[in-house]
Amino acid sequence: MKNLASREVNIYVNGKLVGTTDKPEELVNFIREKRRKGELPQYTTVAYNEESNDIHINTDAGRIVRPLIVVENGKPKLTKEHIEKLKKGEITFSDLVKEGVIEYLDAEEEENAYIALSEEELTEKHTHLEIDPLTILGIGAGVAPYPEHNSAPRITMAAAMGKQSLGIPMSNIKWRLDTRGHYLHYPQVPIVRTKHQEILGFDKRPAGQNFVVAIMSYEGYNMEDAIVFNKSAIDRGLGRSTFFRTYDACERRYPGGQMDRFEIPDKGVRGYRSEECYRYLEEDGIVAVESHVKGGDVIVGKTSPPRFLEEHEITIQVKPQRRDSSVVVRHGEEGYIDKVILTETKEGNRLVKVKVRDLRIPELGDKFASRHGQKGVMGLTVPQEDLPFTESGIVPDIIINPHAIPSRMTVGQLLEMLGGKVGALEGRRIDGTIFSGEKEWDLRKALEALGFKHHGKEVMYDGKTGKKFEVEIYIGIAYYQKLHHLVAGKIHARSRGPVQVLTRQPTEGRAREGGLRFGEMERDVLIGHGAAMLLKERLMDESDPYDICICSKCGDFAILDYKRGLKYCPICGEIENLYSSKKIPFVRIPYAFKLLLDELKSMCILPRIKVRDKVELEDFEEFVEKLEKEKVKQKQ
């Protein structure tokens, strides 16, 4: 650090300015010395920023800190004696922290540190030494093998997608009633593993399978990260999973002695659905186990008393009309009833939980990813007999595109495929831990010793023609993860359905049976093509058409009086018969436009609409003929 004694340096404690000093280096070294002696809390950190000329001392909670070995005069304070004592159990890791052998640094103080990866790299300038290079990475990134050979964004993607991968996260899934669960049928331990996995116990709860991967283009079906799958491998169970969803219902009690009831609702109940929706319910109003249900089917029949007191008061002379409050399967989902559990809540109300099971076999559009951020969706399934095969008869499980490798620089995946091949042939696990895994040349030598070419490529033959490919194909074993993003949970279409209360436009989203938004950019395309009728159809007729009568005299909305059979304008007093349209014609506009006009009125702006005669679409041909005749007359 440069000597800046002539300048006053600001001192901040947890972001608050507490004072200044003209000897920043002495202060920083003094605080670090006190921390190492145990006179200050071990998680206290101090950082001196020369550029901004300030010292930050942090003691607050919520900071990420990590342990490092302290280095003084080019030598680590951790000795062989410490390690022997640790092995014998005479001292603990906490004792090393108290002695100042190991200290915790946060992100801010790490900027002042010069950290060596290994003891061989240590110099006089180094301040700290990594306990092990693998501590650089967190849990998500540490699971990926050979991450030092990948670009940083791909490691970040791999860490994010690892959290979405399917496996068996707990051993009691058969008895659990989670709101949602998705489990892989045959998870495998990865052939190429890391030390992070051992520490985490990943092998006990793996989340993926070892795929035989070939890197080659296949008739254009694996362009843009699509993946070609071996259909026979899928039939044997590759990537198969089960999705569970739990629905629950409770018999609530209400003031006045009324309560919900589990039953098959009568036809007279308010909100009664069609008979077909209740077909799987048994006498007690609860669905039968192993029934196949789909979206909209009732799985727990339930009726409730009138929602508001006014409803009950209206029907007080008659028997109060109950309403249907049954539990239905979500729109777009289906499955078999796996389990039904009847129990009670703390208040003593009956509670029923229904678990629905759905088998998810990989299909076109399902998302898969390697541990190197190479994600893709299934683009084609091909029978095994039509896929390329090697001289030894190996057929790949998946084929990925070669264009996915160069620009993304995921060399770690190529090394994993090489290591997976060696591990499968030798029957052992390969270590792919960051900076300390098995070296590339060792894997190449092992392949040569096994009778394969050191570069991992093999001669392959076309499954359809039997002809040998002109080039050798890179083939190996990589660990692939099936992700939760399946096409079955995303596919959506709608012809008609619910609309919003305010705008009267279709609802949004798959869960609400919503429409597909026709946005500004799509609108501009139709304008550019001059497709006026299609534009009108999309933006009004199929969205929120609204018939309203407008006064042709003042241009404001008129009022319909169906009882008297009249239309009248509240502004200028124009009156007209309901079936006439000379003074107060009917106009079809988008309801959103009517809402806009109402909102303008609320801000004391009165918009007026000019109304003219229109040409009916049915009479358009006659109208054109008249124009043509008039043109002919004018020429004569």
UniProtKB/Swiss-Prot annotation:
<keyword id="KW-0238">DNA-binding</keyword>
<dbReference type="InterPro" id="IPR019969">
    <property type="entry name" value="RNAP_Rpo2"/>
</dbReference>
<keyword id="KW-0479">Metal-binding</keyword>
<keyword id="KW-0862">Zinc</keyword>
<dbReference type="InterPro" id="IPR007646">
    <property type="entry name" value="RNA_pol_Rpb2_4"/>
</dbReference>
<dbReference type="GO" id="GO:0008270">
    <property type="term" value="F:zinc ion binding"/>
</dbReference>
<keyword id="KW-0808">Transferase</keyword>
<comment type="similarity">
    <text>Belongs to the RNA polymerase beta chain family.</text>
</comment>
<dbReference type="InterPro" id="IPR007120">
    <property type="entry name" value="DNA-dir_RNAP_su2_dom"/>
</dbReference>
<dbReference type="InterPro" id="IPR007121">
    <property type="entry name" value="RNA_pol_bsu_CS"/>
</dbReference>
<feature type="binding site">
    <location>
        <position position="572"/>
    </location>
    <ligand>
        <name>Zn(2+)</name>
    </ligand>
</feature>
<dbReference type="GO" id="GO:0003899">
    <property type="term" value="F:DNA-directed RNA polymerase activity"/>
</dbReference>
<dbReference type="Pfam" id="PF04566">
    <property type="entry name" value="RNA_pol_Rpb2_4"/>
</dbReference>
<dbReference type="Pfam" id="PF04567">
    <property type="entry name" value="RNA_pol_Rpb2_5"/>
</dbReference>
<comment type="subunit">
    <text>Part of the RNA polymerase complex.</text>
</comment>
<dbReference type="Pfam" id="PF04560">
    <property type="entry name" value="RNA_pol_Rpb2_7"/>
</dbReference>
<feature type="binding site">
    <location>
        <position position="551"/>
    </location>
    <ligand>
        <name>Zn(2+)</name>
    </ligand>
</feature>
<feature type="binding site">
    <location>
        <position position="569"/>
    </location>
    <ligand>
        <name>Zn(2+)</name>
    </ligand>
</feature>
<protein>
    <recommendedName>
        <fullName>DNA-directed RNA polymerase subunit Rpo2C</fullName>
        <ecNumber>2.7.7.6</ecNumber>
    </recommendedName>
</protein>
<dbReference type="InterPro" id="IPR037033">
    <property type="entry name" value="DNA-dir_RNAP_su2_hyb_sf"/>
</dbReference>
<dbReference type="GO" id="GO:0003677">
    <property type="term" value="F:DNA binding"/>
</dbReference>
<dbReference type="InterPro" id="IPR015712">
    <property type="entry name" value="DNA-dir_RNA_pol_su2"/>
</dbReference>
<dbReference type="GO" id="GO:0032549">
    <property type="term" value="F:ribonucleoside binding"/>
</dbReference>
<keyword id="KW-0548">Nucleotidyltransferase</keyword>
<keyword id="KW-0963">Cytoplasm</keyword>
<dbReference type="GO" id="GO:0006351">
    <property type="term" value="P:DNA-templated transcription"/>
</dbReference>
<comment type="function">
    <text>DNA-dependent RNA polymerase (RNAP) catalyzes the transcription of DNA into RNA using the four ribonucleoside triphosphates as substrates. The Rpo2 subunit (Rpo2N and Rpo2C in this organism) is implicated in DNA promoter recognition and in nucleotide binding.</text>
</comment>
<dbReference type="GO" id="GO:0000428">
    <property type="term" value="C:DNA-directed RNA polymerase complex"/>
</dbReference>
<dbReference type="Pfam" id="PF00562">
    <property type="entry name" value="RNA_pol_Rpb2_6"/>
</dbReference>
<keyword id="KW-0240">DNA-directed RNA polymerase</keyword>
<dbReference type="InterPro" id="IPR007641">
    <property type="entry name" value="RNA_pol_Rpb2_7"/>
</dbReference>
<dbReference type="GO" id="GO:0005737">
    <property type="term" value="C:cytoplasm"/>
</dbReference>
<keyword id="KW-0804">Transcription</keyword>
<feature type="binding site">
    <location>
        <position position="554"/>
    </location>
    <ligand>
        <name>Zn(2+)</name>
    </ligand>
</feature>
<dbReference type="InterPro" id="IPR014724">
    <property type="entry name" value="RNA_pol_RPB2_OB-fold"/>
</dbReference>
<dbReference type="InterPro" id="IPR007647">
    <property type="entry name" value="RNA_pol_Rpb2_5"/>
</dbReference>
